[in-house]
């Protein structure tokens, strides 16, 4: 317990991260690896909330000719598929896990109830929040920020395919510069690709730090909660 800097965390996993190199669907090898890393944290006594995206299955913006609200609801359902896959993988490792959804589907998951979520965390269960906020026009980044505030998380761990925040796309620009630290205002003013502006503003208003790091490097989640210098930290000062 001595090397834990953050006792209660919100882990934000993109749908693309769960797809691995396939880019679509679920790569169960990746899901299992992530689950093992989460189990390691649970065994250390870290309380974990998680939000999963749905971009590996559906993105609202993909439905160009669709009603935006309908397309967004389809995206929310996609996050539920990912949440159930992660839950199953964690439970196979013996980790007690609950899925809570913002849209009621009582046959497969609990509805989101803040007090119940807090109780699960206190009992050492992982809580996966799915179906976004339950409202269209809000991203899963905003869901992560909102749920982090509601469960009083110490930090949001934003797992990406890149090892931090850069001034340019590092995949396209060899000389892209990585930031070690940023303020919320930096992110908003410069339009940096961390979270969308709604999510960033919510984190700023509630003083929730955001750590952006690469998910594909084994052990990075453990390093993150231990306070080791990885990725990019976004905070007040």
From Swiss-Prot:
GO biological process: 'de novo' CTP biosynthetic process; UDP biosynthetic process
Coiled-coil annotated residue ranges, if any: none
Record InterPro entries: AceGlu_kinase-like_sf, Asp/Glu/Uridylate_kinase, Glu/AcGlu_kinase, Uridylate_kinase, Uridylate_kinase_bac
Binding positions for ATP per the UniProt entry: 12-15, 55, 59, 166, 169
GO MF annotations in UniProt: ATP binding; UMP kinase activity
Residue numbers binding UMP: 54, 72, 133-140
Activity regulation description: Allosterically activated by GTP. Inhibited by UTP.
Catalytic reaction(s) noted: UMP + ATP = UDP + ADP
One Gene Ontology cellular component: cytoplasm
Positions of the UniProt region annotated as Involved in allosteric activation by GTP: 20-25
Localization in the cell: Cytoplasm
UniProt protein name: Uridylate kinase
Source organism of the structure: Clostridium tetani (strain Massachusetts / E88)
